[in-house]
Amino acid sequence: MRGVLLILWLTIASVWTAPAQTDSGPVVVLKHGSLRGQYVTVKGSEKAVEQYLGIPFAQPPVGPLRLSAPKPAEPWEGERDATQHPPLCLQDLDVMESVSKIMALSFIPPTVSEDCLYLNVYTPSQRSAAEKLPVMFWIHGGGLYMGGAIQYDGSVLAAYENIVVVVIQYRLGILGYFSTGDEHARGNWGFLDQVLALQWVQQNIESFGGDPNSVTIAGESAGGISTSMLTLSPLAKGLFHRTIFQSGAATLGTYSTKHPMVFAKVVANVTECDSSSTELLVSCMREKTEEDFIKATKKQKIFLGATVDGVFLKDVAEEILKSKNFLKVPVLLGVTNHEFGWILPLTFAPPGWDKGMDRQEVAAVMGQFFPEEVSGVNDLIIDEYLKDAKTPEDVRDGFTEMMGDLFMVIPVIKVAGYHRDAGAHVYMYEFQHRPNLFKDIRPSFVKADHADDVGFVFGACFWSGQIKMIGTFTEEENQLCKTMMGYWGNFVRTGSPNGPGLVNWPTYDQSNKYLNLELQQTAGQGLRLDKLHFLNVELLQKLSALRAT
């Protein structure tokens, strides 16, 4: 069924940098109270960074605030410790552990709790009192289902690019996106958390040396879906000035719906709540324990996303984009060249898929996520992607290409076109580098997989501390880290990724130019336009011909 969740998780986890040897950490005074953070040092940089962890931006969403819009955090007395990561929002920790192993990571995740609406701030320590630095506001990925702020250490990016990095958490899964479509549970709770966190930045970021008038929202996978959604929401107007979405866009799959009760009934079933009335259903869910929701999540992976509620979202994403009635800000967006290469098919493809597949197996997986609304459409798509396949390995490669295109690449390219045609400056990339640390973990056919770009954006080459990536980066990859931090830092500062010492990144205009991000960067043109044309034009023609026979 269409409601089956594809866990578009973000899988690159982060690391804490080593605390600098100082007697006491930095103190910042906010209107809600004071915070004591810690100084951290960054490999390869002379700058120290102030790190503030677990800052509350909302009241705990528990009791009557469960399945409700978030409320701003309340003031606290005294000096609040800001040196520990907050608990993760409710999720299945077994999934995070499994993903970590696949990604060659070694770290101990924190506990999970409904009381999870916190954010982390990383800011360069050596700055003048009058200096206001641009802000990158990062939203984690994980299919709107898993993940958390602990996965990202913003200190390397903050030090190298002299920017303020904010990493937030938001409610996930059932508690983040459940909706009955009426006044009892309008939904979009996780997106509303993101809006409140942006409002917190507007009110508080100057205390950390940040500029509230220069905020870039950024994210990957579900984080990219989120930043894309925020450009469509009237609630986010004036809260940010540039946007980055990596391997995710608002049009991806069925991430926005006008009919949330289809999914609400599935939730009612796994939580054992009466769905005969929406009032009874929501009342029952507010009485459930945290463990009840974790058990429900383990029982069935439920797709939940944005609901057209008339408040956060006025219409489904595609219709808003077509109308051009959205926030026109500079956009940087892109994909990897093998989005469905390894991590995602490990979950959804049949056993032994990596050795080779047949057409029947391809059709079975595709049918899980794309049930045929028009007879014959899936066969036509499979025909296109397998037309040159001669061996089981060829079929496997066509399968991974097809699923990557349908789930991520084509939606991102379409959204890029909508923003460009509405008058926004757009910069597109394809990340093509296969990280060295996966050379002995992944099969040789896997190229740049989903989320492989994120570590380079955050300077993973220079991570050190309690959370480790098992493997090594080459000297060429160290330079790629610096290059990508440079591009992202420039965009956060100016709305353009270009700057001294970097290969020119062309705008994504009517000529469809983009940048190939490899050890050596090059300009490209017409990314996947042949497949976009097939899916938008040729497929309809073939279906018409099929009906005529």
Identify the role of each PLM range.
Residues 2-14, 106-278, 282, 311, ...:
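Serine-hydrolase-like catalytic core of hydrolytic proteins
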Residues 250, 284-475, 487:
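Substrate-gating cap/lid region and adjacent catalytic-acid/histidine neighborhood
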